[in-house]
Structures are given as C-alpha cells and as structure tokens.
C-alpha cells in the first residue's frame, strides 16, 4: 500500500518517498503517559502490557512530574516487563510534553500510546502487527471500547459503574474526522516514518485534542488502515482525566485551534472523497448549502420560540393546513 503522499507524487510522475517497509520487521514502542498520581491505575495499564501475545515491544513510561515520582513508578513496575521498560521524567508544558518526550525514545518500527487510565487487551499489539505486516507504512486503527468508572471521590478508577460501550465507528473516515475526533489515542499504531523523516510532533499549544491534531496531520501523509477488532478499553472516569478536568470552553477553544491548524496547510484526501465533497454543495460564501439551510432553520426556530405571536401564527397556519388536507382526503 502506497501512502497518500506517494500516490499524489506518482500522479505527477514522481517516485515514492515514504513507501518503504521497515527492514527490521514489525516491532513496537509503547508510550505510556502518566502524572504518577494514579499508581494503581498505572499498574493495571502496565499489567495489560505484560500479558500481550505479541512479544516484540518495549515500553516507555513518561512521567509528567518529578524524578522522585519517576523513581516510585520505576520501583513499582511489573517484573514481567523487566528489560523492556524505561521510565522518563518530564516537567513543564501541557499534555503534549510527555508525548513528545516519548517520541524521542521510539526504537520500534511502529509506536502506540496507552494512557494510565487505559487498558490494552491481550491481542492489542498482535492485531496491530498483523495489519502492519500487510500495510507497514500506514497508521493502523483498531476499535476502542469505553466504560464509565467511578473514582469514589479520589483520582484512581475504583470500579465500573456502567456497561462496556462501543461508541466509535469501526472504520477511520478522514472527512468525518475533519469535524470531530472519533478515535482515542490507544486505538492507533503509527509507523515510525511519521516522526522520521516526516518530523511530526504533538502541538504544545493545545491543552486538549493534541492526539486528534497529530492523527489528522499524519493520516493525510501516510493513510490509515482500519481493523474492526476491539483491542483496548478507555475508562471514562468521573474525575481526574481530560474529559472531566478540562472545561467546556477549553475544549471548544482547542477544537477551533485544531481546525485553524488544518486550515493553514493543504489537505490531502483519500481517493474517492472528492465525490463526497461534491455532494455537500458548497456555495460562494464559503459555507456548504447544508450549513446555510441549517443556519436558516435555526434562525427561524429562534424567531418562533422568542416570539409567542409568531409561534401562534405558525401553529394556526399548520393547523389550518392540516384541516384542509383532511377535508380534501374525504372528498370523493
């Protein structure tokens, strides 16, 4: 499978620049991000890595905290990961800081991420590896399931309070991801070429959505192969993770920042998506016809709900029309 970038170059008679399979075979570096404040949860995440059925991987635990916390994490690491685990401490910066520090320690042909509130199923890496063997230069996307967990007033996940759900689509769709993120970070395995030679990094300016921004820029360059297996579990905590820690305005501002960043560079779409774009019927003011129709409908609804007189007139008109239709239906 050629990357989208190589397909574009081939259309202009240029040779591929990225379509090179890793010479050493498929191996993984797993980057685990933690603040070190949830040792039990981190231990469970590392336990899930210790039971992987695919053997060729190393683990980089990046502690967003002090060296002392990193030493505690190192001391409590699962013995089954002995020899393949390193712990790195970073300070300062936001959520991207530990991710970028992890990228500096990637040794595998591919890398993937597991936050300390995520759990990997035993076939997590095996599923990635099987797909990567067929498409070594593409991002591999599996399915992540979610489950609500309570912290009972603390910071650690204590017990599940809901059933396991599957809210994310089975297949990656670049156009759908232009509007919102539909892929948790633990659902993805990236080929190392996105950081070398492409040089992608996580954006330090984003307080949240740093994973969505990184995914979109990488996906347009190398493409995404989807596999339908559910291989990881994202535990939605009632306190302490990004969903609950960041305010709604923070999420909204970060969303706008990601869209702005996407808008500053050319967009490379998969083959076939031009037909879907044509179906949105863009108009000359820059919006799609769907957006214009939706805005008009919302404005009309706003007028009706704000003005009892307009609402009453609209209701009377609809009632009169309904009576007329019934009378017409009774006529021979």
How would you describe each model-predicted region?
Residues 30, 168-255:
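Conserved nucleotide-sugar donor-binding catalytic segment
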Residues 56-68, 86-91:
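Short beta-strand/loop segment that forms part of the nucleotide-sugar
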Residues 1-48:
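N-proximal low-complexity "stem/linker" segments adjacent to membrane-targeting elements
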Residues 123-158:
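Conserved donor NDP-sugar-binding/catalytic core segment of glycosyltransferases
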Residues 90-106:
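Glycine-rich, basic loop-to-helix element that forms the pyrophosphate-binding segment
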Residues 47-56:
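Short, acidic, metal-binding catalytic loop of nucleotide-sugar glycosyltransferases
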Residues 256, 260, 264-332:
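Boundary detector for helix-to-coil junctions that initiate low-complexity/charged tails
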Residues 111:
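Short aromatic/hydrophobic "clamp" motif used to bind/position activated sugar donors
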